[in-house]
Regions:
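Polyanion-binding surfaces on beta-sheet-dominated domains and ring/shell assemblies
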Residues: 1-168
Length: 168
């Protein structure tokens, strides 16, 4: 977007169904839409959500759950959504863009949650790469078919021109 500093993008999202991790799902959908639109970006925006859940009733231990369901989100002690800018070509491959947290976590739990979300967002980025590769293959196939059709059309036009010359 540096080349087009005045470029503005408005994204409108409507929730049709919420099975959990809604914010990270919406952010990932926006990120993929921006990638597929061809807008030049410094990296890919990928996101993930993690929840801090009680593992047992009696011991009070807590564990992090990645990509929680809606039910898990409501039962969680805390949850956090992290958005990252991922660019494999730069020295800082993963930059934290922002977080949204609900509930209370200790400083250590926050660091663990961000690390878990970073790993998950990196996996989302790899999925985006697979989608983009597939789209490129489809485009190349379509383009190749178009070239083949153009060659057939040219041959057909040449044969018509030759027949027309022969009739004269």
């Amino acid at each position: 977007m540096e080349k087009n500093a005045s470029l503005g993008v408005i994204v409108s999202i409507q929730e049709l169904k919420n099975d959990g991790s809604f914010l990270s799902s919406a952010l990932n959908a926006c990120g993929l839409a921006l990638i597929l639109s061809g807008i030049e970006m410094k990296g890919w925006m990928c996101s993930a959500t993690a929840c801090l859940m009680k593992t047992g009733e009696e011991d009070g231990k807590l564990s992090l759950v990645l990509d929680p369901t809606r039910e898990e989100e409501t039962q969680a002690k805390a949850s956090m959504t992290c958005a990252f800018l991922i660019n494999e070509e730069t020295e800082d491959k993963t930059i934290l863009l922002g977080t949204k947290m609900r509930g209370k976590m200790t400083e250590m739990e926050v660091f663990e949650c961000v690390a878990l979300c970073r790993d998950a967002a990196t996996s989302v980025c790899k999925y985006f790469d697979q989608v983009l590769t597939l789209r490129e293959r489809e485009f190349e196939e379509r383009y190749r078919l178009t070239d083949e059709k153009m060659q057939m059309f040219k041959k057909m036009m040449e044969s018509i021109a030759e027949k027309t010359k022969a009739v004269k």
